[in-house]
Amino acid sequence: MDQDVMDFFDFSKEFKREVAPQGYISSDPKMMATDSIDSKVPKREVIGTEYVTEIVAKEKGLLNRTLRDECPQSKRKHTLDDLDTDDEEEETEIRRDDEYYKKYRFNLNRDKNLPIYAKREEILAAINANPVVILKGETGCGKTTQVPQYILDEGYKSGKYCNIVVTQPRRIAAISIANRVCQEREWQQDTVCSYQVGLHRPTSLEDTRLLYCTTGVLLNNLIRNKTLTHYTHIVLDEVHERDQDMDFLLIVVRRLLATNSRHVKIILMSATIDARELSDYFTTTNSIPPVISASHGRKHSIEKFYRDQMGSIKWKEEEDDQLVPQINDHGYRAAVKIIMVIDNMEREGAIHSRMSYDEALRYGAVLIFLPGIYEIDTMAENITLMLENDRNVKVFIVRCFSLMTPENQRDVFHPPPPGFRKIILTTNIAESSITVPDVSYVIDFCLTKVLVTDTATNFSSLRLTWASKANCRQRAGRVGRLRSGRVYRMVNKSFYQREMSEFGIPEMLRLPLQNSVLRAKELEMGSPVEILALALSPPNLSDIQNTILLLKEVGALFLTVDGVYNAMDGDVTYWGTIMSRLPLDPRLSRLIILGYVFNLLEEAIIMAAGLSMRGLYVHEGSSSRSTRAQFDSFWMHYIFADGSGSDLVAIWRVYLTYLNMVEIGHEQESAIRWANRFHVSLRSLKEMHLLVQELRVRCTNLGLIPFSVNPSQIMDDREKSFILKVIIAGAFYPNYFTRSKEMWNEHDRHIYQTISGHDPCRTVYFTNFGPSCMGELYTRRIKDFFHDARIPPENMDVTFQPGSEKVFVTFKQDDCVADSSKLVSVPGRVQSEVYKAVRMRLSCMQRIIRIMRPKQFMNYVQERGIGDVIEGRWIPPTKPLNVELLALPSVFSKTITGLITGIINCGKFYFQPLSLAECIRNMSEIFNAPQQLRKYVVDACDISKGMMVLAKRDSNFQRATVIRPENQSNRQPMFYVRFIDYGDCALLPMQQLRFMSEELIQQYGDLPPRVFECRLALVQPSSMVHGNYSWPTAANDLLQFVAKCGRIDIEVYSLFNNVAAVLIHMRNGTINDKLVAQKLCRRSDEDYMSRKDHDFRLRSQESGRYLSSAERQQINEEYLRSCQLPQDFDLPPPPQDLCGTNVRLKGPYSPLECSMQSIIRVGSSKRVNIDSASVNAVLLDTDPQDHHDHLIVAHATVESPNGQTLTARGTTLMPNVQGYGALMVMLFCPTMQLKCNEEGTSYVSILAGLGCDPVTGEPYYAEHDVLINLDVNILEDDLVLINQIRYYIDSVFFNFKEENYPAVSVNERESIYTQLRSLIKRLLSKDRSYIGKNMSNSDFVWETNPELPMPNEPFGKRAIFPMHSLTELKEDDMGRLMNLRENCSMLHKWRNFEGTLPHMTCKLCNQLLESVPQLRLHLLTILHRDREKQIDFCNQ
């Protein structure tokens, strides 16, 4: 802010030299370490729960001393609200509440039919006599609603003050139960009885005596108050669920109950509870909690059958397979057999029973419990196969899982069609959340999927495991509602009894502990280890240690405690305080924190809320909807992402659309239609809306309030999008992945070879369609494959390669004036249709085509005269091509003079050579002759798409093609046309069109355009200036200005697919260089085919001087002919009844499909997938000419059960900015080492993470160390900028240890905000030169270097982002420079060699060169040209 701060970042100032880490690492062609011995993570020792015994013994000793050392001399009386220790032997003043009880009506008549009523007196007596009571009552016995009322009624009778709180694990339960109690007692809501979920609570709780709340609400209140005495009774319901909130609440309750709140009564309730475990947990020397059981008999009996009791079903799998949690084919078939047995049983029973078979069907629904959606779909397929084999059994299949829409979930409750049996395929959602009355049969595979997190890696995995007996009992309880029922358990009885656990694994033993550790810190009653050791099921000590490392990584904890490093603890940062107060995962809280820093708090809150929601997008299962509907469901993600390549941006835009609809006040039916159209869940959006509101309030309470900026400082959409991606990268470090490119030498060539020279950004291909299939006759049927992807057949060309089994589908570019509202934006150069096509393959859409047999085919084409048959070989019909008439530039022409006649943007404009001016004039005179302009268009229906007409351009009529009709305005027909000989487009009324006479069509119908398409060479749009690979308006305006100047000279760099890459000469250089200098675009490599053509043109122009004019013409015609791609014949296919052979095509594929790699050490050797619901599920190389990896950031990473594969969720594709990944790592890592090459002349790699032990050099958190090999130059200036940004982020939240809140003022925040925007822009908009990858042998090694100067730390050890140190670079050795220049000179000499090249290495770029063509193309890359500049090499 002032000069002193700026001086701090000046590396030219003198530094105090101290010991600091430093070292070298290796690099490879994938920007990361290879899977070498060094890169493999040493196995971290797992430390179990041995630590618990000592801590628990110490705790019990403390509690016993507290009970024993009571002070009998004290005569002080106190009330229940006293926060001091409540000594049981002292007389306690009873607080009365008579006036309150007179204020409200108390009806003491309780429902005596509920089973719990029989235990009423026993329960009340136990509560009066014991501090803790355990109540075990079956679901439906009435414990949740009645027990709190019993307590309140007793208070009313005695006049004693009561304040009861009842916890519920879910929001909806707390709300609905409170409303039900109010209705039962006829109390007005939010008076005697109320609820609190999150921050949603009554304005005042003064009159509330019975509060239903979520577990987290009570937990936060107790941690904040550090006493229970605000309540007289605390009822913890559904204790068996054992989530982390409940387990931590038990710790807090037990601790406070024994210290300062011993007069508060605790009631623990559940349907399936381990009563002995809980009783032991709360047992003290003075008290053992009693256990009371309340159950009710069932009206209808339930029979249970196990696998070994089902004799009629023959099980085929091996005995060992029965022990593995899985469902194999035998299991699915066995379930189908059970359904058939049930049906036969009921048919026979109907003969001897009063209930008819049809009635039995109606009340005989079968509920099948399966572990996941995949198993549900597989089970449905098996049942469908059964129906095909046995027509007598009719079933109505209903799916039920959490991601379905509420409308589809309601199908579960509807009766089946007459004569059908309802089969419900469900996950464990139907265990307790859904009760279906007509279920009489349950088939239980006794399996479930649980989320387990490895705390060392922070990777979560969804593991298939055996359900607990408690789960199975709840599942069995789903039958017998209306009649007797049966339960079929697909395991042996002995296995169920002996091997399956009684209860599930508590969350504290399988999920991340970050929130529990932060709560332990906030509780201030000991270290996290000391607090969590007191849990009902204590976690492993190594899990606590790993969690503390994770919290240090996200900035929630400092590395030190009171300035001293502690592996098991750390002081809480203000970031940690914020994270503990927000009901989110710490990384989502970090997203909000960084959103606040950059004044994009609202956007960050929305994204964080959306990521914490499950089922925002609707998934219906693979066979429940049409193929097109499934595809539309996925494609809506792209619409909302709007070309950002970000699931988070898509969430933000979905929510804004929903919010706008809510504010406008759309009716419910309209909202449902909108949700169905865009395949989003209204229920999830409503929950998300509530969470967004809650987060806003919590952020305000924490002082996180956005400030207003001047209109001139408001971010435009481009900058906001860019800054949001910086925030996302900062929030989810180090969940970074690189979009890996194959870097082997011939990969570029392989891309084009794969698709036979087509444009990879517009082309996909199928395989398995052999040459004998005569594919040209079936092009229309191949186009029909894309119907479900909504790609019209006229928007594609289908071509073939002779002798190949490939089919190429090339999508046409929508030329000009495209209807942008109908387009879906995707990042980079690749057309959206390519994404759609690849998604078709991933969605397993069927691609079967019926063809004729070869002999029949030959007869068919000969009879109809389709093409020619020569020597038994069919030659498809072709259009003659006169290449000499093409306006394309000659291979011998380097510079051409002419006019730019039509401009779409800098990447697409049209050039009319001056040599064709005479031809243009002659044509114009003919077209505008009076006799040619008399053919008026009278009826708009006579105009069709693709028709050639005469259209008015300026004052004359010219040749034009009709692109499409436009919506009629004022009944005036309008048409978009493209002028064939100028390239520009126009929207014209019908009156400005004329039909072409047959004479004109015959003469000019086949004449190629008198212009050719161009694009600027060696440049591409900059992500910093404009997103979605779009050219900025300022760049297009400059091109328009140049075009208006008249004649210009263009230099043809290359010609590919009839598009010329050109450099446009100006007075002071080229427009290409000027746009780069003005930062309106950035330098770019040309792709393989362009460089190949450029090299060919250079050599042709060199040799052309020695050729005659006729020879040059012949060579040029051959060259232009080779540039033309095969044609789409678009022949009518033969009738289906003549086609008797099925061919299954494989694909479509794109040669641009690429994979990802994790950059953290523990994930570097694992395969990486992207979640199938992500907008990046189809991952393509959006800029194939760019040879540098792109960064993808994930919100979360899930590991496969076998540990070999990672799945990235909530992904964002980062901008294609040079060195973006390295810059983000340096910006947001805790610390790093920037390492040099062996000569010390340049920085070559980054090792980032929590750092290492300064004595031993052992990394603190080796699993999450990040290694990046640099491919661009990082300079000292970059480090200065990065340190400044880190300083400013820290300064927003810095507070001294004795302060509760940061001291930064609003004015200072505005100044910081302005500085950060400027610094980020300067850092990311630099045009960095490229460097070759460096190799080293010390991957992931943190080393110490006593010579390394340590920067001064403005915030000392209380910095979340400490300053990075910098190694001073050395000057290049002159001998080494001369060696490199000599190597370059030799490479240039070999460039013109026509023989076999001995293997060479470009020492500048560390690139092995194996052939002369490869050498030539390498010399044209930006990498090599930049490196030549760096060593001042000039080729003579």
From Swiss-Prot:
CDD domains for this protein: DEXHc_TDRD9, SF2_C_RHA
Localization of this protein: Cytoplasm
Gene Ontology BP annotations: dorsal appendage formation; germarium-derived oocyte fate determination; global gene silencing by mRNA cleavage; heterochromatin formation; intracellular mRNA localization; mitotic chromosome condensation; oocyte karyosome formation; oocyte localization involved in germarium-derived egg chamber formation
GO molecular function (one): RNA helicase activity
Key words, A-Z: ATP-binding, Cytoplasm, Developmental protein, Differentiation, Helicase, Hydrolase, Meiosis, Nucleotide-binding, Oogenesis, RNA-mediated gene silencing, Spermatogenesis
Chief location: cytoplasm
Catalytic activity: ATP + H2O = ADP + phosphate + H(+)
UniProt xrefs under SMART domains: DEXDc, HA2, HELICc, TUDOR
Domain Tudor stretches: 940-1003
Domain of life (superkingdom): Eukaryota
Stretches assigned to the Helicase ATP-binding domain: 124-291
EC number(s) recorded for this UniProt protein: 3.6.4.13
Occurrences of domain Helicase C-terminal (ranges): 337-524
Pfam families cross-referenced by the UniProt entry: DEAD (PF00270), HA2_C (PF21010), Helicase_C (PF00271), TUDOR (PF00567)
One GO location term (cellular component): P granule
Motif stretch (DEAH box): 237-240
Record-listed ATP binding positions: G137, E138, T139, G140, C141, G142, K143, T144
Family to which the UniProt record says this protein belongs: Belongs to the DEAD box helicase family. DEAH subfamily.
UniProt xrefs under PANTHER family: ATP-DEPENDENT RNA HELICASE (PTHR18934), ATP-DEPENDENT RNA HELICASE TDRD9 (PTHR18934:SF113)
Biological function: Probable ATP-binding RNA helicase which plays a central role during spermatogenesis and oogenesis by repressing transposable elements and preventing their mobilization, which is essential for the germline integrity. Acts via the piRNA metabolic process, which mediates the repression of transposable elements during meiosis by forming complexes composed of piRNAs and Piwi and govern the methylation and subsequent repression of transposons. Involved in the repression of LTR retrotransposon copia.
Protein name: Probable ATP-dependent RNA helicase spindle-E
Organism annotation: Drosophila yakuba (Fruit fly)
